[in-house]
């Protein structure tokens, strides 16, 4: 730190907490305020007294039954324009406060050990880390997903809301990057527990650890820099408003201020553990320590404490004791230390430490460049950076690529770089290029074709395609044998020779066919215009196909093996045959109460023989009278019985038919009402079936989610949409069947149509990155077409 440069000095000290201050965060309101949490079980809101002098405790909030370890601010909403305060504690709970509430508005329960880190995102999303080795994602008062993968406490968490990314740092020495509930990347480098994370930009972040180092990372995985300066555990890290410089606090009794990648100033404090820090909008630094005192440091002369207050602080510092085992003092041989005369020699750098012997005592001093003197920091009792560079054939943004093309979108305008490796999917690269540079997604095929042609990849022909019902596959898509020429030979796809020209007749790709949902009306799609025939879906999708003869034959066969008290009589079987006949033949006749009673008896058979009865139920539940009887009159009893059949250890046939029955319930008002009331329980049980390999179950799961999406498109319930989006994201991780994938895409499109909040929530879950791979699916064409339409909304 050069002489004359601005220097942080004490602004004020804020007593109030009775024990260690463990967490600090800047507040949205009032301006310039901050919140602190402590081992004394309280949360306190501090507001500035005036533009230049001190803070006053405005509110003291209680709610935890043990010490409070972390805090964050949830952004403002229509209901809470000043935002909310979230605190995590040793009682395993997260308390949510409004700014004027002494007690929690609500408490989030789910962690099994201390909640030690919190970070907020958009629309009420909250990420928590715990000693139980997990992180949890919350929306309002609901846990949406649990992130599992660390093998020790999750000490630090951060959300990057714009990219839908989440970061977790752990005592297992690793940092993990999560997207839509899955671990995308693990960052290795720290040699001890990771204690803190801070976001620099959309592509970079900082971490600090018990190994006394700070690391700067790219989200792609590269460690760009390692900073050394602290000599003990680093507990917290906070970034300045310029998003470049930062501050850290540690077990070495110091606050360190880092500018331009170097430690510009070291401030010692009269406490052993400097637990936490935050940087206010005006650049002032707030620090919490093990002595229960909050201290504010400033560069501003106007906000600097009085000379008397600074002298009192230095006196307190000089009276502190330093453990030689935890300080940065090295091996000490008191007999070889110089005397006080050594203090007449100036230091060589800001924060330099010097030990002198004064009789039997060993005193520690720190050099202040701006003051030009040695300041005593206590009585003793008891780093260089590293750059990582890569080299290769073509280097772009720190990574090696086989090709880096320059793309001119507008003649005479700026060019864009398009990096590509031969092992990459050209459609994914093209999609990422268009998204990154905010270019029209309708150019996807042209950019992908450009990549293929210029890297000697295989040319994929496009031709006339006829569309079909995307759910049944009737009249399925068959690639055309001829079509318009889309040849682009070694040319920039936007402005190069032989380039694609939007609206050019020679480049149009014509597609004709029927509406894939209704079978009516042909449509025409060109590169400049895409007709969305897929979503939002307005009506529930049902499972209708059946072979009544086979169903009844199996029912009669298994009836012989049923327990005596469960067996059906010949008359009972006749009644079931009649109800099945009138359902399958669309008869206007209504099922009788006796028929419904026998059907209820049959679906309560033992699990190993019940499936043909469930198949009759699946078909019958679409009838208004059956739907009313089972979904309204029997209601909870009916849904509980079917939910029990979804047990992952149960029989796949029962699981499948129960799911299909739930899907068919949506056709009537009574069924919709029951499905909405049972949504949380049903979806949480249904999602447990995702990990199996049965494609029919995956299709049924996707259809159930789609039918819920139809309901939520009419009723904008953000919590319900959030659960559906989470389920979609979870199933997408394991699904292989393209029909199930297509239905999930339609569900996703239905959920986010005309709803900016749902779009942002989907982005925060990283769903857009999950579905990108489907833009290159050639058959069935409905998958890639629907995917592109969804991505256009995202």
From Swiss-Prot:
Residues 533-793 form the PUL domain. InterPro entries: ARM-like, PFU, PFU_sf, PUL_dom, WD40/YVTN_repeat-like_dom_sf, WD40_repeat_dom_sf, WD40_rpt. SUPFAM superfamilies: WD40 repeat-like (SSF50978). ARM repeats lie at residues 546-588, 589-620, 621-668, 669-714, 715-754, 755-794. One of its GO terms (molecular function) is phospholipase A2 activator activity. Belongs to the WD repeat PLAP family. Interacts with ubiquitin. Interacts with UBXN6, VCP and YOD1; may form a complex involved in macroautophagy. This is Phospholipase A-2-activating protein.
């Amino acid at each position: 730190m050069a002489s004359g440069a601005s220097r942080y000095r004490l602004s004020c000290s804020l007593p109030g907490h009775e024990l260690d201050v463990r967490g600090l965060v800047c507040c949205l309101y009032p301006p310039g305020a901050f919140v602190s949490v402590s081992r004394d079980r309280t949360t306190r809101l501090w507001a500035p007294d005036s533009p230049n002098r001190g803070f006053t405790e405005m509110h003291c909030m209680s709610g935890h039954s043990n010490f409070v370890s972390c805090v964050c601010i949830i952004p403002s909403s229509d209901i809470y324009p000043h935002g909310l305060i979230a605190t995590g504690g040793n009682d395993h709970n997260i308390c949510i406060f409004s700014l004027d509430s002494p007690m929690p508005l609500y408490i989030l329960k789910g962690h099994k050990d201390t909640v030690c880190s919190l970070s907020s995102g958009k629309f009420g999303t909250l990420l928590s880390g715990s000693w139980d080795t997990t992180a949890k994602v919350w929306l309002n008062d609901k846990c949406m997903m649990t992130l599992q993968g660390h093998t020790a406490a999750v000490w630090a968490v951060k959300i990057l809301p714009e990219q839908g990314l989440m970061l977790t740092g752990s005592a297992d020495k690793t940092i993990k990057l999560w997207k839509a509930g899955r671990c995308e990347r693990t960052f290795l480098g720290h040699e001890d527990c990771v204690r803190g994370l801070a976001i620099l930009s959309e592509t970079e972040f900082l971490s600090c650890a018990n190994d006394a180092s700070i690391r700067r990372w790219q989200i792609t995985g590269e460690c760009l820099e390692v900073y050394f300066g602290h000599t003990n555990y680093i507990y917290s890290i906070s970034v300045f408003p310029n998003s470049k410089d930062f501050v850290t606090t540690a077990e070495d009794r110091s606050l360190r201020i880092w500018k331009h990648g170097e430690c510009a100033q070291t401030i010692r404090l009269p406490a052993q553990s400097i637990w936490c820090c935050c940087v206010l909008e005006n650049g002032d630094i707030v620090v919490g320590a093990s002595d229960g005192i909050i201290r504010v440091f400033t560069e501003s002369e106007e906000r600097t404490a009085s000379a008397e207050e600074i002298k009192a602080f230095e006196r307190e510092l000089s009276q502190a004791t330093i453990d030689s085992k935890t300080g940065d003092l090295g091996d000490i041989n008191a007999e070889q230390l110089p005397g006080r005369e050594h203090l007449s020699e100036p230091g060589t750098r800001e924060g330099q430490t010097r030990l002198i012997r004064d009789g039997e005592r060993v005193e520690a001093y720190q050099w202040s460049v701006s003051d030009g003197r040695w300041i005593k920091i206590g009585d003793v009792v008891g780093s260089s950076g590293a750059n990582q560079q890569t080299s290769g054939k073509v280097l772009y943004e720190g990574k090696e690529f086989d090709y880096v093309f320059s793309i001119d979108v507008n003649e005479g305008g700026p060019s864009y770089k398009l990096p590509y490796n031969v092992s990459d999917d050209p459609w994914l690269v093209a999609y990422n290029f268009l998204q990154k540079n905010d270019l029209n997604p309708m150019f996807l095929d042209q950019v992908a074709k450009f990549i293929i042609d210029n890297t000697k990849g295989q040319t994929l022909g496009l031709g006339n395609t006829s569309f079909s019902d995307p759910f049944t596959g009737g009249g399925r898509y068959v690639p055309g044998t001829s079509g318009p020429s889309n040849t682009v030979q070694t040319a920039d796809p936007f402005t190069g020779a032989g380039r694609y020209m939007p609206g050019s007749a020679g480049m149009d790709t014509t597609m004709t066919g029927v509406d894939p949902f209704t079978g009516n009306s042909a449509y025409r799609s060109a590169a400049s215009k895409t007709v969305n025939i897929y979503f939002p879906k307005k009506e529930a999708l049902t499972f209708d196909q059946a072979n009544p003869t086979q169903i009844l034959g199996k029912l009669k066969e298994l009836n012989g093996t049923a327990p005596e008290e469960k067996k059906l009589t010949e008359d009972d079987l006749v009644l079931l045959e009649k109800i099945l006949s009138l359902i399958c033949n669309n008869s206007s006749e209504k099922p009788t109460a006796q028929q419904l009673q026998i059907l209820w008896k049959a679906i309560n058979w033992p699990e190993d023989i019940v499936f043909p009865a469930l198949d009759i139920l699946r078909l019958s539940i679409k009838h208004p009278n059956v739907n009313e009887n089972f979904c309204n009159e029997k209601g909870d009893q009916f849904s509980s019985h079917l939910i029990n059949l979804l047990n992952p250890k149960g029989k796949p046939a029962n699981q499948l038919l129960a799911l299909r029955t739930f899907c068919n319930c949506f056709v009537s008002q009574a069924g919709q009402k029951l499905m909405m009331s049972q949504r949380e329980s049903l979806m949480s049980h249904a999602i447990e079936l995702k990990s199996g390999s049965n494609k029919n179950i995956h299709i049924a799961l996707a259809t159930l989610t789609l039918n819920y999406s139809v309901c939520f498109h009419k009723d904008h319930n953000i919590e319900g949409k959030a659960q559906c989006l989470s389920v979609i994201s979870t199933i997408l991780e394991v699904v292989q069947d393209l029909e199930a994938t297509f239905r999930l895409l339609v569900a996703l499109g239905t959920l986010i149509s005309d709803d900016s909040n749902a779009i942002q929530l989907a982005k925060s879950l990283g769903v857009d990155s999950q579905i990108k791979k489907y833009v290159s699916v050639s058959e069935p064409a409905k998958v890639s077409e629907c995917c592109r339409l969804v991505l256009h909304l995202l």
